[in-house]
């Protein structure tokens, strides 16, 4: 097996959309039912995708709102972004658009690995954002999209596998686009 690659992934979104729950479900395989606002946590996990081992460093961020100042640390050495909203919250869906805009302003690249995640899909009766709305938003950003339920462990692993694939796809396109020049 080739040497493992390190990847740093930031998880961003409005408060109480399930960023920490999704991350803990992926890393530890358990759902944390209590809400304890995150300041910033970092988790690590080894995962194999397409025969390649990845050492993931997951930056679970504090919830942002439309007025939050986007910390510059969220743009340094990050290989991919998981933007999370709750399918039960119009506010979180609107705020994720603002966060995306701030992210593009900070990073300065139009093509960055982004995974849009509609979380809490298990709360059928409280749903206010349709699957189609989430998918359309992701397509407008040229981003990957999945809905998830951290509580029911639906697609938590898929979310993190997919962001790795998105990062590798963009890294591959960047390295293919590179040209070299030799001065003799």
Swiss-Prot record:
The keyword Disulfide bond does not apply. GTP binds at residues 16, 18-21, 32, 35, 38, 119, 122, 150. Its EC number is 3.6.5.-. The modification Cysteine methyl ester is found at residue 181. SMART domains: RAB (SM00175), RAS (SM00173), RHO (SM00174). GO terms for biological process: positive regulation of TOR signaling; positive regulation of TORC1 signaling; small GTPase-mediated signal transduction. It comes from the Eukaryota. Transmembrane segments: none annotated. It catalyses: GTP + H2O = GDP + phosphate + H(+). It is found in: Endomembrane system; Lysosome membrane; Golgi apparatus membrane; Endoplasmic reticulum membrane. Associates with the mTORC1 complex (MTOR, MLST8 and RPTOR) in a guanyl nucleotide-independent manner. Interacts with TSC2. Interacts with MCRS1; the interaction maintains RHEB at the lysosome in its active GTP-bound form and prevents its interaction with the mTORC1 complex inhibitor TSC2, ensuring activation of the mTORC1 complex by RHEB. Interacts (when prenylated) with PDE6D; this promotes release from membranes. This is GTP-binding protein Rheb. It comes from Bos taurus.
């Amino acid at each position: 097996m080739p040497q493992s690659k390190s990847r740093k992934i930031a998880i961003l979104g409005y408060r109480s959309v399930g960023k920490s729950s999704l991350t803990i479900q992926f890393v530890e395989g358990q759902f944390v039912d209590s809400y304890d606002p995150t300041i910033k946590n970092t988790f690590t996990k080894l995962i194999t995708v397409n025969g390649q081992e990845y050492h993931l460093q997951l930056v679970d961020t504090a919830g942002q709102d439309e007025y939050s100042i986007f910390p510059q640390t969220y743009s340094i050495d990050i290989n991919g972004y998981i933007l999370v909203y709750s399918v039960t919250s119009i506010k979180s869906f609107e705020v994720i658009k603002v966060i995306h805009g701030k992210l593009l302003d900070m990073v300065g690249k139009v093509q960055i690995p982004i995974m849009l995640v509609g979380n809490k899909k298990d709360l059928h009766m409280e749903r206010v954002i349709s699957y189609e709305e989430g998918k359309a938003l992701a397509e407008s950003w040229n981003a990957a999209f999945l809905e998830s339920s951290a509580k029911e462990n639906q697609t938590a692993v898929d979310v993190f596998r997919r962001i790795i694939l998105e990062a590798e796809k963009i890294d591959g396109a960047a390295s293919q686009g590179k040209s070299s020049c030799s001065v003799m």
